[in-house]
Amino acid sequence: MNGINVTITDMMNCRDRRVSIQNELISKYDKPVLSFCMNIPGPVKTNEQIRKAFDSGKAELLKALSAHNITILHTEEFHEPSGDELIMALDAPAEDIKTLATEIEESHPLGRLFDMDVIGTDSMKLSRGTYRKCIICGCQAQDCARSRKIPWRNYRRRLRNY
């Protein structure tokens, strides 16, 4: 698959930056923050196909926020080898935002590859309440990821066929 291979260190640095931005936005606005990135197995975290899927998820998210009259207070967007990311401070209750995000993750054809986290003003991530299913086999996604029972190439094929 085309793209730049990233290391675990790259991913940890990306995570640290994301948490720092989330905390800054919560401090600045005293409102919940939504972080959207992709759950992509393997060493390549972005390329043209993955970006297309990310953009589709972003469009769906923006449409849902608009439909529910949720004001976007601040947006940060990154497209780096470690992946595509969108971080937003939103003027709405965290639970309402999480409900919208979960609906998108569950209804979009590639929603199982979307990672839409909502962080409340207490800096705690809201839980989905239910486990996500693997986009390939339908089992609990966490189990598939931990056991690596499905080769990452199968996920890439799914992206190509989207």
Which residues fall in each region the model found?
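Long, contiguous binding/interaction regions
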Residues: M1-L65, D96-G120, L126-Y162
